[in-house]
């Protein structure tokens, strides 16, 4: 009997070692997967797929700039303890002050084992400015087709780490991506009806290149990315001169930037700011745009309305 007990202990130990080596977590006992997302957009997509099956921590607070961020002690702790970490990649958290690179290095986390870029598979667009030329444009989520890629990558890694809930994740993924796909198709039809001479989305940061490509609306901006100088007199003058040659009816300003440079552009061109829109963050809970889906629907509706005036 003693020998049998010893063999049973060895057998169970072997199972635990295999599970640890494969990176899978045993969630049958009710212990949830610990997941970290770098920003509110990725966190919301993750929540739509994982529901209450995980413990989720989002690092960059709603409304703050994910390009350059200083992690708090809680972020460091949660990252160190995480079973799975999702980040955007393509020059967002790893550009600027490279805060995410430092965070995962200090937590001794390994890429494609502990942390994964949800943008894997996106058709990347590159920056064009003198100081940023050749670097990746990180704002891929502003094209709903890329949001679907994000969701699929998230579901894949959740299922790999937590196979006990794979069916649950895949069911939620299907429902969620069908919803995003429907909004994407409806929005493309809407933008196709706007006259070509009115099609120009003007924002503070040049974050809408992926949006432009997806919905056939060229973009113009004051500065290209939030890691460079923002709203200099020269940048404003360049945009004002460009807009005077167009028939664009409306300007837009993002919720996460200083609106003063765009107000100057509006005054100098007599083109009104139609609406505040979202780029790097969803809205606070309970407000319009408080999820990735509602943020994108709000953006698509407001931009179409503003350009149709």
Swiss-Prot record:
Mutagenesis / variant outcome for changing residue 285 to E: In strain: NA-1508/92
Effect of residue 81 to Q: In strain: NA-1383/97
One of the Pfam families matching this protein, by short name: ZnuA
BP GO annotations: cell adhesion; metal ion transport
GO molecular function, one term: metal ion binding
Record's bilayer topology term: Lipid-anchor
Outcome (variant: residue 62 to V): In strain: NA-1383/97
Entries under SUPFAM superfamilies matching the protein: Helical backbone' metal receptor (SSF53807)
Effect of substituting residue 83 to N: In strain: TIGR4
Keywords (A to Z) from UniProt: Cell membrane, Lipoprotein, Manganese, Membrane, Metal-binding, Palmitate, Signal, Transport
GO cellular component term, pick one: plasma membrane
Effect of substituting residue 248 to T: In strain: NA-1383/97
Lipidation (S-diacylglycerol cysteine): 20
Cell compartments where the protein resides: Cell membrane
Keyword check for Metal-binding: yes
Other information: Zn(2+) can bind to PsaA but cannot be transported by the permease into the cytoplasm. At high Zn(2+) concentrations, Zn(2+) binding competes for Mn(2+) transport impairing growth and rendering S.pneumoniae hypersensitive to oxidative and polymorphonuclear leukocyte-mediated killing.
Family according to the record: Belongs to the bacterial solute-binding protein 9 family. Lipoprotein receptor antigen (Lrai) subfamily.
Descriptive protein name: Manganese ABC transporter substrate-binding lipoprotein PsaA
């Amino acid at each position: 009997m003693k020998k049998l007990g010893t063999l049973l202990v060895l057998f169970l130990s072997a199972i635990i070692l295999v599970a640890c080596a494969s990176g899978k977590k045993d969630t049958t006992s009710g212990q949830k997967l610990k997941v970290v997302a770098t920003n509110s957009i990725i966190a919301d997509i993750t929540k739509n797929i994982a529901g209450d099956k995980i413990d989720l921590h989002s690092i960059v607070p709603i409304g703050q700039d994910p390009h350059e961020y200083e992690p708090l002690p809680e972020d460091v702790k949660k990252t160190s303890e995480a079973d799975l970490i999702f980040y955007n990649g393509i020059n967002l958290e790893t550009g600027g002050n490279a805060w995410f690179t430092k965070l995962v290095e200090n937590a001794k986390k390994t890429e494609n084992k502990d942390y994964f870029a949800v943008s894997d598979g996106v058709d990347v667009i590159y920056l064009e400015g003198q100081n940023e030329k050749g670097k990746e444009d990180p704002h891929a989520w502003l094209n709903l087709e890329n949001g679907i890629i994000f969701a699929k990558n998230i579901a894949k890694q959740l299922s790999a780490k937590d196979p006990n809930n794979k069916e649950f994740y895949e069911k939620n993924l299907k429902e969620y991506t069908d919803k995003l796909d429907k909004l994407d198709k409806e929005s493309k039809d809407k933008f196709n009806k706007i006259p070509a001479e009115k099609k120009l989305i003007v924002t503070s940061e040049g974050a809408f290149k992926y949006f432009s490509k997806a919905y056939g609306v060229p973009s113009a901006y004051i500065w290209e990315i939030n890691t460079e100088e923002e709203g200099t007199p020269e940048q404003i003058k360049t945009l004002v001169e460009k807009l005077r040659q167009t028939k664009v009816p409306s300007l837009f300003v993002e919720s996460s930037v200083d609106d003063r440079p765009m107000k100057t552009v509006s005054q100098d061109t007599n083109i009104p700011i139609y609406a505040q829109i979202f780029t790097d963050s969803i809205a606070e809970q309970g407000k319009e745009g408080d999820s990735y889906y509602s943020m994108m629907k709000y953006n698509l509706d407001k931009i179409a309305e503003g350009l149709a005036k």
